Amino acid sequence: MNPIIFFMIMLTIILGTTIVMTSSHWLTVWMGFEMNMLAIIPMLMKNHHPRSTEAATKYFLTQATASMLLLLAITINLMSSGQWTVTNMINPTSSIILTIALAMKLGLAPFHFWVPEVTQGTPLSSGLILLTWQKLAPLSILLTMSPIINLDLLLMMGLLSVMIGGWGGLNQTQLRKIMAYSSIAHMGWMVTILIYNPTLTMLNLTIYIMMTLTMFMLLITTSTTTTLSLSHAWNKMPLITTMMLTTLLSMGGLPPLTGFMPKWMILQELTKNNSIILPTFMAITALLNLYFYMRLTYSTSLTMFPTTNATKIKWPFMTTKQMTYLSPLMVISTMTLPLTPMMMILH
């Protein structure tokens, strides 16, 4: 892709999200979403492959439907209140429609079907943007509306997302699809605690973005997209592969890694609010995520896939220069659990 075009596309993506996050007028929020959506489609199609075109088409159709629902919710609320202010969503019908529209943009279950397909059909760099930056704008609107949003609908979608994110990743061999189902599960954890403690949602989002960023950077460094190529990467880059597997376990929420912190704090916060059944179900379904991460780690580190080629160990210092940016990311993604007592004061 031409560097100038790439710069303009990235600038538009950043500008669209910034407009959504800083605007208090519904029309400019909708315009920000549209700018963001139209700018990322060329990023999804930069491989010039039918699979990328299919993924971009699916993304466009889903996001266009969500934008249509967003406009419908804004119109119904405007007829009821006569105001364009984001925080003034007084009509319960428009609040429910808006929640569904934002759930489609986030990829929450039961509107999650596009996330694995689109992520699988795009390059790793575009998948990284899709699973991290693209979550900021819809979540910022949900955070703004958290006092007036429909609690039962959000909790239902959150629990369903955690369950689907665990079940969907069980039989996957494509790492991008595994990351997509992991994203669905993490979004479920975030929206479940959104009503009770919005600050905890922001903390969870930050940790999720750091872990996903680390994982995708490692995948890009090793050019790994399947479990088979991950097992072969062990012979080529043992250190980077070890970092990758540690990050996977952290994303699964295995103590004493960073990913355990948000799950611990969310379960504690839900229990404080006299919710017992919901955190119990979420803790049980979180084991599904941990299972397929541990299965991936086990199959990569303790078993050897059959191969027809004579795989040789590569020179270990080939990727030293590329690993400078990975050091701080790895520390944040795997070693910040001791900071949990300090994070407990967030309300």
From Swiss-Prot:
Known EC number: 7.1.1.2
Q: Which reaction does it catalyse?
A: a ubiquinone + NADH + 5 H(+)(in) = a ubiquinol + NAD(+) + 4 H(+)(out)
Subcellular locations according to the entry: Mitochondrion inner membrane
Which residue spans traverse the membrane? 1-21, 25-45, 59-79, 96-116, 148-168, 178-198, 200-220, 237-257, 274-294, 326-346
Q: Supply the alphabetized keyword list.
A: Electron transport, Membrane, Mitochondrion, Mitochondrion inner membrane, NAD, Respiratory chain, Translocase, Transmembrane, Transmembrane helix, Transport, Ubiquinone
Kindly name one Pfam family recorded for this protein.
Answer: Proton_antipo_M
Q: Name one GO biological process term.
A: mitochondrial electron transport, NADH to ubiquinone
What is the membrane topology listed in the Swiss-Prot or TrEMBL record?
Answer: Multi-pass membrane protein
Taken from the UniProt record, the cysteine pairs bridged by disulfide bonds within this chain are none
One cellular component term (GO) for this entry is: mitochondrial inner membrane
Q: What GO molecular functions are on record for this protein?
A: NADH dehydrogenase (ubiquinone) activity
Q: Which family does it belong to?
A: Belongs to the complex I subunit 2 family.
Q: How does it assemble?
A: Core subunit of respiratory chain NADH dehydrogenase (Complex I) which is composed of 45 different subunits. Interacts with TMEM242.
Q: What does this protein do?
A: Core subunit of the mitochondrial membrane respiratory chain NADH dehydrogenase (Complex I) which catalyzes electron transfer from NADH through the respiratory chain, using ubiquinone as an electron acceptor. Essential for the catalytic activity and assembly of complex I.
Protein name, UniProt field: NADH-ubiquinone oxidoreductase chain 2
Q: What is the lineage of its organism?
A: Eukaryota, Metazoa, Chordata, Craniata, Vertebrata
Q: State the gene name recorded for this protein.
A: MT-ND2
